[in-house]
Swiss-Prot record:
GO cellular component: nucleoplasm; PeBoW complex; preribosome, large subunit precursor
SUPFAM superfamilies: WD40 repeat-like
Name of the encoding gene: ytm1
SMART domains: WD40 (SM00320)
Region span, Ubiquitin-like (UBL) domain: 21-102
PANTHER family: RIBOSOME BIOGENESIS PROTEIN WDR12, WD40 REPEAT PROTEIN 12, 37
GO MF assignments: ribonucleoprotein complex binding
Subunit comment: Component of the NOP7 complex, composed of erb1, nop7 and ytm1. The complex is held together by erb1, which interacts with nop7 via its N-terminal domain and with ytm1 via a high-affinity interaction between the seven-bladed beta-propeller domains of the 2 proteins. The NOP7 complex associates with the 66S pre-ribosome. Interacts (via UBL domain) with mdn1 (via VWFA/MIDAS domain).
Disordered as annotated region, ranges: 257-285
First and last residues of every WD repeat: 129-168, 175-213, 224-263, 298-338, 340-379, 385-425, 453-490
Protein name: Ribosome biogenesis protein ytm1
């Protein structure tokens, strides 16, 4: 009986290998695209990714083979062509268009910067970062800066040699009085931060001519929240900031002192309190205090994240522990739309090219939501792979399809929303690469199972085109990983 099965299987394999199909190989990346004169090619339907990759390399005349991935109708080919045709009911008489892209290059560990306490937030200033482009500034290669906000209440600016260029002042001199959970560059000379002391603080940042030392100087203290602040978003062209707070509200602020209203008196520390907390120096520290342009109140639980629409800064989005994603008109401070889900939403990122918002959840997955009122379903796709809460998200600067997530399971995962399958839960995506904490590897515990990511929880991740993937968390480190062109550009 086994012999009959084996011969039948062999015959089927032989038949599939002998079948042929016309394929049109295309690429959106000009540097690897075949000449337009390259027409459809007749290939065996038994070909898989490796054989197709060899074929493309031969057609391109590459001396050094480049690994490629292949997509049909926007989805990765994970089987033979024959199996794909059968599964999708497509005739082998059809000319099949197959798109090829560079395969994933695993992001390698570049460096780690050690802190004295947990690191709650990271951001990058580079030639390709938003803060640089907004200011029409220039950051030369090697002069990139990394900003960290720590649970010790201090901001630090680092160079790429893991040296601290500047540290923010103590509470006595205008610094934060509690843990920092969010910090961002507004421009090469301006920083904003917030945390558990309920304040949003604006800072001036300057460096010496040689770039070896710098100064973070307090500029404005913004009061309005009645509980800790979990995240920040900035839009420098409009001089606006969004803050997400555990007091269930979103703060909408101006970076310009002249535009901002007075700070609420009931939230500003009294003069007596301030003088007792701040030691006397040659001249007492006097920092302007301002209030919010608006407080957006509709959520019924802590707000985890608030961001600007990438293409329209008058639109904002927020996520909350109340399971909802909300859309706001920032001009009128009005609630526009509410999308309710089944889980607490802990992080948020915009994928504008696909009209999607990525939301990290307490249920260990990422839900992609179409915020447009015309959308008929709440969840467009679910990304699964993490084993604990997903608390930070950052889009891939190289590809509109890419995303990275940071989780309390101690990993960052790279996603390509084209890498999907369909099951009982609908369209489900799987991560294409997982980045573990270097601190575990150095302890010889890279394969150790950490319950809930104990000791290595990731709190923040930022993906920068120039610097790479920068993450930070409970292991008191910033970690930098880089893989050139991790996903295809598109």
């Amino acid at each position: 009986m086994n012999g009959v099965q084996d011969s039948t299987s062999a015959a089927a394999s032989s038949q599939s290998a002998q079948r042929q199909v016309r394929v049109q190989l295309v690429s959106k990346q000009e540097d690897i695209a075949l000449p337009e004169s390259t027409g459809p090619i007749l290939v065996p339907t038994g070909l898989r990714r490796y054989a197709l990759s060899t074929l493309v390399n031969n057609l391109l005349g590459n001396d050094k083979p480049v690994p490629f991935e292949f997509l049909i109708n926007g989805a990765f080919l994970r089987t033979s062509i024959d199996e794909y045709l059968t599964a999708n009911g497509i005739s082998a008489e059809t000319t099949l268009e197959i798109e090829y892209i560079r395969a994933l290059i695993p992001p390698l560990h570049i460096a780690s910067f050690e802190h004295d306490d947990w690191v709650g937030s990271v951001d990058v200033l580079s030639a390709t970062s938003l803060a640089t482009s907004w200011a029409s500034a220039v950051v030369s290669p090697g002069q990139e800066r990394i900003l960290s906000g720590s649970y010790d209440g201090l901001l630090r600016v680092w160079n790429m040699s893991s040296q601290i260029v500047a540290t923010s002042p103590s509470p006595a001199d205008g610094g934060h009085g509690a843990s920092i959970k969010a910090a961002k560059f507004i421009s090469p000379n301006s920083i904003v931060s917030a945390g558990l002391d309920r304040t949003v603080r604006l800072w001036k940042y300057n460096e010496s001519d040689d770039g070896f030392s710098g100064k973070i100087t307090p500029q404005i203290e913004l009061y309005g929240h009645k509980s800790g602040i979990n995240s920040l978003a900035v839009h420098a062209p409009s001089n606006r900031i969004l803050s997400a707070s555990s007091d269930h509200s979103i703060g909408f602020w101006s970076t310009k002192k002249s535009d901002a209203p007075a700070a609420p008196e009931n939230l500003v520390p009294s003069a007596a309190s301030r003088s007792s907390k701040r030691r006397k120096v040659s001249s007492s520290v006097s920092i302007p205090q301002r209030g919010p342009l608006a407080l957006l109140s509709s959520h019924t639980a802590p707000v985890s994240a608030a961001i600007f629409d990438t293409n329209d800064s008058t639109v904002g989005y927020s996520t909350s522990w109340d399971h909802s994603l909300r859309t706001w008109d920032l001009v009128t401070a009005a609630l526009v739309d509410t999308r309710s889900t089944s889980h607490s939403l802990l992080s948020l990122e915009h994928l504008p090219e696909h009209h999607l918002l990525a939301t990290g959840t307490s249920a260990r997955h990422i839900t992609l939501i179409d915020p447009r009122t015309s959308a008929t379903t709440i969840s467009a796709m679910t990304l699964r792979g993490h084993t604990n809460a997903v608390v930070s998200l950052s889009r891939d600067p190289h590809s509109s399809y890419g995303l990275i997530s940071g989780s309390h399971d101690g990993t960052c995962r790279i996603w390509d929303i084209r890498a999907t399958k369909t099951d009982n839960d609908g369209v489900v995506g799987e991560s294409v690469y997982s980045i573990t904490r270097r601190s575990l590897e150095e302890q010889g515990k890279a394969d150790a199972k950490r319950v809930g990511g104990e000791g290595v929880k990731v709190f923040s991740v930022c993906w920068d085109r120039s610097v790479g993937i920068v993450s930070a968390g409970e292991d008191k480190r910033i970690q930098i990983n880089r893989g050139e062109g991790v996903l295809s550009s598109a």
